[in-house]
Structure formats: structure tokens, C-alpha cells
């Protein structure tokens, strides 16, 4: 089981020389991938599990974060998130590589885990400790269950559909890519159908908004209030659900207070948040059809396990 | 709201209330104006009895100031100090008085504590380094609506207003507002008490027409806001509420008193409209797209203004808008 979990955790892709091993250990790194050409020289480095990286065929992902573009005129003041969730959803069996310097290494690892990606994160010395903290957290919380989704999206693989999926993820509309309408979904969206024509995707935010309107906010399994830079996900758990909160601005700024609403009655909760002190959830309420709470502080990643 | 005096507005003028050069208020003149205004509003003979009509020593009192143009223009600390002086004089302990705003950077720029007795709290819902936080708001009291498709559709009430105060004294100042037309009693108690309200403006469109009254009508704000005191010592007739351009400030040298925010704001609308007319600026009610633009020009504005929000609020029962039914009493000191 531990081996399986370790295999599912994002790897650190490290191209420094073997004499950096002590730096890695000090930062809390236990396992690395190195370029195949350096593998032999790294084999003797003590205290680290070393594998040879095989980047061929891996999909390069963007360094996750926020682009505020304050000096650029645009149709919206909503910060632009650079997220890779939609690309991971489109390639569930893909292998991915992030190039994420500094504290963004933590966000990259959290994003990869949250979306279930087989990913390696290439970072620099400043990224080692944040990466190790997230890996430690991922180990502590254990594996995720299957994702919970409200929307089944029939993807035609086009760039336009990709952008719509990106915006659905970014707007916290829980989406699953399906080959045909899934009766378990609250809403099925066939991209290019009469109801959701391709021409509408010329304005992707409008199409995402239209999909949200068809679903309705009342039927959304998960909603968040208080930040425009957080992506939330939901995975199933044996006796409840797991809420994932990814702060895409986390490398620069923590969030003080985020309100979360989850459909369903969950009187029990447990929070795990990387880099934040263990904390109780605030203003916890369980109503007839939903559970709400406030997380006091969100750095890069937090997981809230809710149980019946 | 509208409280015991619907349609009644008392205006007290004192030529020595503020120095136009230094923008400093005269504490003695302000004290006299507060007393004259409260006596005229209530008909009482003693100022203590006038204040006791609204506040008792057991109350926890929130004084809602307006600092959105601070430090250039804001609720004058001398006015707040005068109100606190009267509250403590009728037995409200300083520790039961809060001066509050939404944003700490604006509130702190005024330095209210320097003017107030020890023990009075000065508190913002959102801290200097935590702008946008939800922690200062009550998660259970909110208005939920979508204006432009935003994902966060809630505007929550300031937590101390929801959980702590038994009475609120609303102390706005007299300003034009580039979205709402004017920002007076209604907007100060509405947008000044709820989170996530800037989402109601985008490009040249603003939903202030209905949102201001809707927020002001939310309980417990509506029933706990017992007194309106408009700080019209100084005002802004264009490019409000922030007042970056001193040429658009003016000095009515007045304090207004009432319990009806609609009647008070109708008076504010008339005041700002008259000043704009005197300055040759287009009406607040102008909706011409050609007047959209950089508001350094008094005939241009970023939004199509919605001064109709005041009449809309009257339809929610928040006060009297009909000019024929508003009784204005003017006091000259």
C-alpha cells in the first residue's frame, strides 16, 4: 500500500549534481528522479530513493499560478489562473512534467495530486522545502477517492472545448469528461450539440456561464466564497467526501478566510493544511441539505475530510 | 429605519464649523451643532434626553463612519468625537462603543483614536493586510445575487454589526458617487456594511439602483440603525467617493439629523445636484453614453449613475422620498 501511494505521489525531477544530496535531505526530500544520464552517479547518494527519469512522451505543463495583468485592459477584472487541471482531465493516463521554480513547486505537486496526475516536478533549490512539505502532507492524508462531478462533458478534443473545460475547472464547476451522457451526472454537456453549439465557444466564459446556468448554483456539490484565486475539487471517501482547496496565489499570498459549501450533511470534519497550524474550521453548520464552514487560513493547499 | 421621524430632516449650519484651507473641523462648533440638531430633531429640551430617545446605557453602539475618500474626505473625527461625548454623557461606557468601517487602510488613515476617549473601539472588517477576507463578516447573514456571472454571489454583513451591536448610528458624509449618484445614508449603511459589493459595477454598468436598498433593508441592520447624522461640513460634487481632485470638493458647513435615510438622501441629491448646476456640470440623472469617460472632466463619468436608488429604497419602506412629504427644518448657528 505504501509503495502504491509513493508511486502515486508527484516526483521531484532534480538535475543538480550528486553533491546536492545533502541539500535535498535537509529540505526533507526523500525521493527523486534524475536525468537518465546522471542516474549512475546518483546511485550511491545515501538517504534518497533515486530513479531514472523518462521524460519522453511526458506532457509539459505550465507553472501554475495567477496572472493579475493589472496594467492590461481586459473584459474582466477576475484574475487569470494558470491551471493545468483541464489538461490532466483530458489525459487521464498521461505522464506530466512541471517546471515550477520556488514556492510554485508546492502548488504544482498539490495540483497534480488533486487531479490524479502521474507527474514529476522540476524545481530549483528554493522549491525544495515547499515541495517536501506538500509531499509530506499528501502522504499524511493518504490516497484520494474517485472525483465527484456534477457535469459530464463530452469533449471533441478541440482547442475550443479545451478552453471551456479549463473555465469550468477554474469556476469550480465539477466536471468529468465522458464519452456519452452519464446518467449519474446532474448535467451532461455535449460540446457541439444543438444545446451547446461550437459557435458559442467563441466566447468561452459565456459558454461556461451558460453551463453553470443549466446546472444551477443550488445543485452544485461544492461552492466557495471569498476568493477568486482558489480552485476547489471534491473526491469521494468511504463515509463522506474530501474537499481540496488549491490557492493559485499561494506562492505569493495566503488567503485569510474562505467559506465553503458542500451539498450533503457532514457533521464530522478534519482539516489538513500544508504550512498552516492545525486548526478547527470556523462557523461550521450542517443544514438540511448542505454543510458549510470557513477555513481560517489557506496557504497553498488544504484538504478537508468530511464524514457523516 | 425609517424610525420615529419619517420624512423629517434637520439641517444645522455653522459658518465656523470647518476651515476650508486646512480642512480642520472646529470641535466647539461641532458640539453646538450636534446639540442643536438633536434637540430640533426630537423636540426635547435637554440634549441628554434627546440622545436617550435612541440609545440607552445598556446598548452596544456601532458608529458607522465613511472613510472611502480618507484622509482627504471622510466622516470628520471631530463629529465622531462629539457623538461619543454625548453617548458617554448618558451613561454608555466607552467600552461599549465601536467606530467601524470595512477597510482598515482607509479607517486607519484618519486616526480616530487620537480624538476618542480610551476604551472606544475602532475596528475594520478587513485588515490592512487581509483585504477581501471573509473572517470579518457574518457567514449566516448575506444577500445572494449574481450581477455579471461572478462565481462568488454572496455579500455578507459585517460580523460585529450582526453579532455585537444593539444600535447603530450612521454617520456618512455628503458626496457624489460615480456609480450611485450620491453616497449618503443609504449607501453608507448598505455598501459600508456588506462584503463583496464592488462586483455590482462593471464597465459603465452598475446595479446600485436596487442593490443599495436591498442591502439596507436586511435585518438586523434595518432595525438597529436608529439615527442618521450626515456630516456635510465638507462634500464632494464630482468624482466621488474618493475625492482625488480637490477642485471637486465644497463646504456646505452643515450637519444633518434624522432617522429616515431616504429623506436625508433626497436632500443630499438636491444639494449635490444644485452644486453641479452651479458649476456647469451635467445632472446626476444624465444617462448619455457620450458623457462616459475620464472623470477629471466634471461632465464625464465612469458609469451611468443610478441616483434613482433613493426612490427605490423608499419603495422598500425605508423612508419618505416624496419631496412634498419631507419636512426640512434649518437651524443657523
Located regions from the model:
Chain A
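Solvent-exposed beta-hairpin/edge-strand motifs
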Residues: 259-279
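Low-complexity, Gly/Pro
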Residues: 1-8, 250, 254, 301
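Carbohydrate-binding surface patches
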Residues: 150, 154-173, 186, 226-266
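A glycine-rich, often tryptophan-bearing local segment used as a flexible ligand/cofactor-contacting loop or short
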Residues: 188-224
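C-terminal beta-strand-rich structural cap/linker in extracellular carbohydrate-active enzymes
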Residues: 192, 287-308
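Extracellular/luminal ectodomains and secreted, surface-exposed scaffolds of diverse proteins
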Residues: 278-288
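Glycan-processing catalytic domains of CAZymes
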Residues: 4-198, 292-293
Amino acid at each position: 500500500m505504501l509503495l502504491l501511494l509513493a508511486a502515486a505521489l508527484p516526483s521531484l525531477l532534480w538535475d543538480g549534481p550528486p553533491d546536492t544530496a545533502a541539500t535535498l535531505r535537509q529540505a526533507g526530500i526523500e525521493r527523486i528522479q534524475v536525468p537518465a544520464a546522471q542516474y549512475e552517479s546518483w546511485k550511491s547518494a545515501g538517504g534518497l530513493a533515486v530513479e531514472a527519469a523518462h521524460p519522453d512522451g511526458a506532457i509539459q505543463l505550465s507553472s501554475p499560478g495567477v496572472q493579475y495583468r493589472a496594467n492590461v485592459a481586459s473584459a474582466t477584472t477576475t484574475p487569470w489562473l494558470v491551471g493545468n487541471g483541464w489538461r490532466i482531465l483530458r489525459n487521464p493516463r498521461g505522464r506530466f512534467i512541471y517546471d515550477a521554480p520556488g514556492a510554485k513547486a508546492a502548488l504544482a505537486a498539490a495540483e497534480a495530486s488533486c487531479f490524479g496526475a502521474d507527474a514529476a516536478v522540476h524545481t530549483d533549490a528554493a522549491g525544495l522545502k515547499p515541495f517536501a512539505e506538500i509531499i509530506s502532507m499528501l502522504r499524511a492524508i493518504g490516497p484520494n477517492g474517485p472525483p465527484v462531478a456534477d457535469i459530464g462533458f463530452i469533449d471533441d478534443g478541440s482547442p475550443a472545448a479545451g478552453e471551456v473545460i479549463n473555465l469550468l475547472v477554474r469556476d469550480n464547476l465539477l466536471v468529468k469528461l465522458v464519452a456519452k451522457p452519464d446518467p449519474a451526472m446532474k448535467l451532461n454537456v455535449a460540446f457541439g450539440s444543438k444545446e451547446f453549439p461550437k459557435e458559442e465557444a467563441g466566447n468561452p466564459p459565456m459558454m461556461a456561464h451558460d453551463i453553470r446556468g443549466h446546472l444551477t448554483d443550488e445543485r452544485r456539490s461544492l461552492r466557495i466564497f471569498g476568493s477568486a484565486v482558489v480552485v476547489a475539487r471534491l473526491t469521494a471517501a468511504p463515509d463522506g467526501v474530501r474537499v481540496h482547496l488549491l490557492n493559485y496565489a499561494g506562492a505569493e499570498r495566503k488567503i485569510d478566510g474562505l467559506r465553503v459549501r458542500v451539498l450533503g450533511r457532514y457533521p464530522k470534519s478534519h482539516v489538513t493544511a500544508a504550512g498552516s497550524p492545525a486548526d478547527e474550521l470556523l462557523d461550521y453548520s450542517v443544514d438540511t441539505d448542505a454543510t458549510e464552514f470557513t477555513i481560517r487560513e489557506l496557504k497553498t493547499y488544504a484538504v478537508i475530510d468530511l464524514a457523516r | 429605519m425609517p424610525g420615529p421621524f419619517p420624512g423629517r430632516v434637520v439641517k444645522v449650519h455653522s459658518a465656523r464649523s470647518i476651515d476650508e484651507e486646512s480642512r480642520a473641523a472646529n470641535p466647539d462648533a461641532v458640539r453646538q451643532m450636534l446639540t442643536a440638531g438633536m434637540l430640533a430633531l426630537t423636540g426635547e429640551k435637554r440634549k441628554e434626553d434627546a440622545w436617550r430617545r435612541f440609545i440607552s446605557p445598556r446598548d452596544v453602539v456601532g458608529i458607522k463612519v465613511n472613510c472611502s475618500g480618507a484622509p482627504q474626505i471622510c466622516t470628520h473625527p471631530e463629529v465622531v468625537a462629539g457623538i461619543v461625548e454625548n453617548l458617554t454623557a448618558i451613561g454608555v461606557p466607552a467600552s461599549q462603543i465601536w467606530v467601524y468601517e470595512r477597510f482598515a487602510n482607509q479607517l486607519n488613515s484618519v486616526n480616530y483614536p487620537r480624538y476618542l476617549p480610551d476604551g472606544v473601539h475602532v475596528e475594520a472588517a478587513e485588515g490592512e493586510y487581509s483585504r477581501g477576507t471573509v473572517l470579518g463578516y457574518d457567514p449566516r447573514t448575506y444577500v445572494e445575487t449574481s450581477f455579471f456571472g461572478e462565481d462568488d454571489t454572496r455579500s455578507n454583513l459585517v460580523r460585529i454589526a450582526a453579532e455585537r451591536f444593539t444600535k447603530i448610528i450612521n454617520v456618512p458624509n455628503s458626496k457624489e458617487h460615480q456609480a450611485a449618484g450620491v453616497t449618503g445614508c443609504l449607501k453608507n449603511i448598505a455598501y459600508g456594511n456588506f462584503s463583496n459589493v464592488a462586483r455590482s459595477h462593471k464597465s459603465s454598468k452598475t446595479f446600485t439602483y436596487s442593490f443599495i436598498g436591498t442591502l439596507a433593508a436586511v435585518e438586523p441592520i434595518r432595525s438597529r440603525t436608529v439615527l442618521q447624522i450626515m456630516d456635510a461640513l465638507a462634500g464632494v460634487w464630482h468624482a466621488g467617493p474618493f475625492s482625488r481632485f480637490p477642485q471637486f470638493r465644497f463646504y456646505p458647513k452643515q450637519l444633518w439629523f434624522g432617522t429616515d435615510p431616504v429623506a436625508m438622501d433626497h436632500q443630499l441629491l438636491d444639494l449635490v445636484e444644485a452644486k453641479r448646476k452651479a458649476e456647469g456640470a451635467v445632472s446626476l440623472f444624465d444617462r448619455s453614453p457620450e458623457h462616459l469617460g475620464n472623470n477629471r472632466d466634471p461632465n464625464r463619468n465612469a458609469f451611468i449613475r443610478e441616483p434613482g436608488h433613493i426612490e427605490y429604497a423608499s419603495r422598500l419602506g425605508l423612508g419618505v422620498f416624496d419631496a412634498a412629504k419631507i419636512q426640512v427644518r434649518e437651524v443657523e448657528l
